[in-house]
Amino acid sequence: MKSVEEQLALIKRGAEELLVESELIEKLKRGQPLRIKAGFDPTAPDLHLGHTVLINKLRQFQELGHQVIFLIGDFTGMIGDPSGKSATRPPLTREQVLENAETYKTQVFKILDPAKTEVAFNSTWMDQMGPADFIRLTSQYTVARMLERDDFDKRYTTNQPIAIHEFLYPLVQGYDSVALRADVELGGTDQKFNLLMGRELQRGYGQEAQCILTMPLLEGLDGVKKMSKSLGNYVGIQEAPGVMYSKLVSIPDALMWRYFELLSFRSMDEINAFRADVEAGANPRDIKIKLAEEIVARFHGEEAAANAHRGAGNRMKDGELPDDLPEVELTAAEDMPIAAVLNKAGLVKNSAAARDLLASGGVRVDGEVVDRSFIYVLGATHVCQAGKKAFARITLKSE
């Protein structure tokens, strides 16, 4: 096991806040594997790179020799996390939650080592909790303290409804730490209230309080708003290799350092060397290619990453392409949005038609439906389909 100083440096990499650092140092000094918990409510079936920030940190804890607990909130998922919400979230059914949970496990084990991961479901203890124990849990906190939470306070002061079951969410999440006897809990910055609840409840149940590590919310491809499927600025971890690669290579130059720190498993020394190269005149795109290849390889394998780099990622299956597939070469000074490529290649009548097709899911690149966020990278070759009958293999070359 690495020294306490080395462990602390890796643990704090990219983190927003560590509470309480002195307590964590004391835990690490004992030289015993710590129980590291992170909870995920399976409210949607697909994960994007923003979700993997926490999972990557769990992987780092595994590499340090600690015991990682991947907690699936099948019970809390039916409540709905109110964090940051201005209205009550509709609860999911048990069937929806369990179906999504199975998909989660398949995806996260592309990052975590299954042999070193304990998968837990919080329904295991919550379903067995009787009325007396539940009343004891709710007695650990007051309504006044609950209303100190920013989102609840805003809704209360603006006369927006707060359902009683929403007060239960942070209590149940906090009790998860009691049930698992967690030493450290990870969460996004928007989860700080819930994480602190875990510390408080552990003390109330006679346990040593966990330390909490908050991780930032990853910015999306625009570099401004947090990554979100609804905003279209996301990279799904199940997206086709070519699509994933193209999106990552097209991120703003300034954003790539944030992505390297939070998404890459390269050392900070290596990342700082890349930064020095760029400051010395290296092309930022060459560095983004390294990032894109690493991430594509993580989810699809080395061969898929190499193919994506060559513009050959995820070709359409034989028989789906016309025999006389047109070959089109375009030139440009920089990467181009897919709408402009389709228009310039003659697959659509005009840019407006391209935008309409993209909005309706009528555009495929290498067999995968893409939206307007897809960027055609200089040097790439893709098979493009606009509508049902317009096909072309398009290469975008540098002017």
UniProtKB/Swiss-Prot annotation:
The keyword Ligase applies. This is Tyrosine--tRNA ligase. It is found in: Cytoplasm. Catalyzes the attachment of tyrosine to tRNA(Tyr) in a two-step reaction: tyrosine is first activated by ATP to form Tyr-AMP and then transferred to the acceptor end of tRNA(Tyr). The keyword Coiled coil does not apply. Homodimer. Belongs to the class-I aminoacyl-tRNA synthetase family. TyrS type 2 subfamily. One of its GO terms (cellular component) is cytosol. Residues 336-396 form the S4 RNA-binding domain. ATP binds at residue 229. Its EC number is 6.1.1.1. Pfam families: S4, tRNA-synt_1b. A motif ('KMSKS' region) lies at residues 226-230. Transmembrane segments: none annotated.
